[in-house]
Amino acid sequence: MKAKEIKALSTTEMLEKEKSYKDELFNLRFQLATGQLENTARLKQVRKNIARIKTALREQELNK
């Protein structure tokens, strides 16, 4: 997701997306440990998406 797309979401939607990305990251790490992960670049993408969401949430918090 792009930062603009994330900022357009509501706070609850952002929290839901963050949770889903964290679940996906857990599964990807598990696949990596067991040698089943084929697309290792996805780990970086998911981590960056989580960081983007956390940044947008913090910006909203500070703007209130």
Swiss-Prot record:
SUPFAM superfamilies, per database record: Ribosomal protein L29 (L29p)
Pfam families: Ribosomal_L29
Annotated Gene Ontology cellular component terms: cytosolic large ribosomal subunit
Recorded superkingdom: Bacteria
PANTHER family (alphabetical): 60S RIBOSOMAL PROTEIN L35/50S RIBOSOMAL PROTEIN L29 (PTHR10916), LARGE RIBOSOMAL SUBUNIT PROTEIN UL29C (PTHR10916:SF0)
Similarity section: Belongs to the universal ribosomal protein uL29 family.
Organism: Lactiplantibacillus plantarum (strain ATCC BAA-793 / NCIMB 8826 / WCFS1)
Record keywords: Ribonucleoprotein, Ribosomal protein
A GO molecular-function annotation: structural constituent of ribosome
GO biological process, one term: translation
Matching HAMAP family: Ribosomal_uL29
InterPro entries: Ribosomal_protein_uL29, Ribosomal_uL29, Ribosomal_uL29_CS, Ribosomal_uL29_sf
Name of this chain's protein: Large ribosomal subunit protein uL29
